[in-house]
Amino acid sequence: MKELNKHRLTIIPKYGDYYYPDSKTFEDDKGKIVYYGQQNDFPSSIIELYNKSSINATCVNAIRDGIVGGGLTTQNEEVLNIANRDGESWNDVFKKVALDRSLFGGFALEVIWSKDRTKVTDVYHIDFSYLRAHRMNERGIIPGYYVSSEFQNK
């Protein structure tokens, strides 16, 4: 990027100046995990922009607020009070989901079923920056996902 010294401006490169890696760049050495960015650090880059840029944060928060709106409602408000054993309400979980959707374009939830598997007992938000997809199989199906807070450190 070319810098102009007088006002410390940066010129944004043209569309064609960007490097677009091939698909092999996004697989680990075993070929199972699809990387999120060339160094597998794209989510941390997005979070850094969100935390360091008030304009970026304002835009992301506006999208989040548009998704959340007035929050979740139901005729029996007590249903919304507890989503999991950590004491989070459904609206707490929904706000986290909306922020991940605004930042990353996706979200993840951990759903805990009862022992007899007849009802959902807990729902937890999973930080989307901790999630990576397994490589697609030959039929184009993603067989699973990996969750780790250490992805950007590898």
Name what the model sees in each region.
Residues 1-139:
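Flexible, gly/proline-biased loop segments at the beginnings
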Residues 142:
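Contiguous, non-catalytic segments that form substrate-binding/exosite surfaces or channel walls
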Residues 149-154:
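Intrinsically disordered, low-complexity linker/loop segments enriched in Gly/Pro
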